[in-house]
Amino acid sequence: QTAPVPKAISK
């Protein structure tokens, strides 16, 4: 499972 940049969701 590859998430679409979890960092962007965190911000």
UniProtKB/Swiss-Prot annotation:
Expressed by the venom gland. The modification Lysine amide is found at K11. Signal peptide: none annotated. The modification Pyrrolidone carboxylic acid is found at Q1. It is found in: Secreted. GO terms for cellular component: extracellular region. The keyword Secreted applies. Keywords: Amidation, Pyrrolidone carboxylic acid, Secreted. Is a minor component of B.maculifrons venom. This is Peptide Bm-10.
